[in-house]
UniProtKB/Swiss-Prot annotation:
SUPFAM superfamilies: Hypothetical protein VC0424 (SSF89946). Belongs to the RraB family. This is Regulator of ribonuclease activity B. GO terms for molecular function: endoribonuclease inhibitor activity; enzyme binding. It is found in: Cytoplasm. It comes from the Bacteria. GO terms for cellular component: cytoplasm. Globally modulates RNA abundance by binding to RNase E (Rne) and regulating its endonucleolytic activity. Can modulate Rne action in a substrate-dependent manner by altering the composition of the degradosome. Interacts with the C-terminal region of Rne.
Length: 117
């Protein structure tokens, strides 16, 4: 993982957390954070899922998706409950980027759901 890539994800994390809070999502309540992984080799992606599980994340079943060009890709989510705390999300990002690099799969960011105050 390059320092530049990590910095870009940290910026994404900051902007996303700020936008959620500005929109009124309750920052005092835990949010379900879904970190996304993708790859074209199911067996390799499965190894990344095992690593994410060992790192403390709940791992969903891998799904096969059809791409617009007719190709296929596999993906899964590594899920954790977190407050909207950039430091915690950045720490998760460091762990998960390392897993993605080790297993040669794509880390594809994260998402969550709005929680009303």
């Amino acid at each position: 993982m390059s320092t530049e890539e990590q910095a870009e994800w940290f910026e994404f994390n900051q902007e996303t957390v700020e936008a959620l809070i500005e929109d009124g999502s309750d920052s005092t309540k835990p949010h379900t954070i879904e970190y996304h992984f993708a790859g074209d080799d199911f067996d390799v992606l499965e190894k990344a899922a095992v690593d994410a599980f060992k790192a403390g994340f709940e791992v969903g079943d891998a799904e096969e998706l059809m791409l617009d060009d007719g190709g296929t890709i596999f993906c899964f989510d590594a899920v954790v409950e977190r407050l909207l705390d950039v430091d915690l999300i950045n720490a998760d990002t460091v762990k998960l980027l390392a897993i993605a690099q080790k297993q040669n799969v794509q880390f594809d960011g994260w998402g969550t759901y709005f929680i009303e105050s």
